[in-house]
Structure formats: C-alpha cells, structure tokens
Amino acid sequence: MISVCIATHNGAHYIKEQIESILCQLGTNDEIIISDDGSNDKTIDILLAFNDKRIIIYSFKQPKKSKHSHTYVCKNFENALKHAKGDYIFLADQDDWWMPNKVEKCLEDLKKHTLVVHQAEICNEDLKPKELLMYRDKFVFKNYLSLKVGKYYGCTLAFRRELMKYIFPFPDRLVLHDQWIGCMA
C-alpha cells in the first residue's frame, strides 16, 4: 500500500491537476492523506469533488504561535504522516505535478533502499521547466552531508514505513521537515 502525504493551506490553484497526476499512478487500496491547515479558498471543495475514497482529508489545528512560519508546515506534514497507513510513503507539496512514471520508478528503488531522493524540475505555472534539481546520489545523502548541505525537497522523497519510527515526534522548532526525514534515514 502507498500513502501520499500532502499538507495543504489555500492550495486551490494547483491542487486539481496535482491530485489527477497522483491518482492515476495509485492502486485502489492506496491513499492520499491530506492534512489541511484551515484553507479558506476552494481547496477542500476541489478535493471533495473527486469523490474518491482514496483521498482522505484531516483537519489540522495550528500549534501555538511560532516565530518560524515553516513550523506550521512541518507540523501539518507531521499530522498527515501520522495518519498514513502505507508501506511506502511519498511526500507531495500542494503545487506539485507528478511525472507519469514517478511511483513506479520510486518503488523499484525502494525495494533496495529505505529512502529515495529523485530528480525534479521546478516549473512555472504553465508547467514550463525553469530549473532542474539534480542530486549527486539518487538515494540518500550521508547524514553529516545532509545537515551541512540540505539540498533536497520533500516532493523528491519517498521512503519505506520502517523509517516512521525514527522521525516522530518532529522537534518543536523544526523548520524543514524534509531535511529531518532525510537525516533520520
């Protein structure tokens, strides 16, 4: 079973295309876990319109105020991850669009590795590539390098469930959930 974890907050602009690009790669028993941080746009309406039992939405209440706005994003992702039931966990940001073979390719590598990091393209709103995210090693950086360099993004991570026992709970002042997960691998 695959769990795709997405933290949302007012993500209506891209969420429909994103979910379409993910659903077509999932099986009937897989799931998309949405943790929504109080969206007041059409994000939830768009998600509900799919009428797909694989999309499961959880509400997320912000923790006490933090001077680090990224703390909210990290805690929102933590909420999504805590609800994931899959053997394989994928992270997605609310504005991602997945290439057609992403899941298949990641699953091949996850047979041999606990965590994989893949290449990604940063695109403009018309999906025209602006920048290619290249990694020297397509799996995971060594922990000391991850802390020093920290150049991978959650949308490029997939990992096996066994990693979950090492990542929870997220530290209270965590700023980069993706770096944390990579370092715990």
Positions of the model-derived regions?
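Short, well-formed alpha-helical segments that are part of the catalytic scaffolds
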Residues: 11-24
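A conserved acidic beta->alpha catalytic loop
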Residues: 36-45, 62
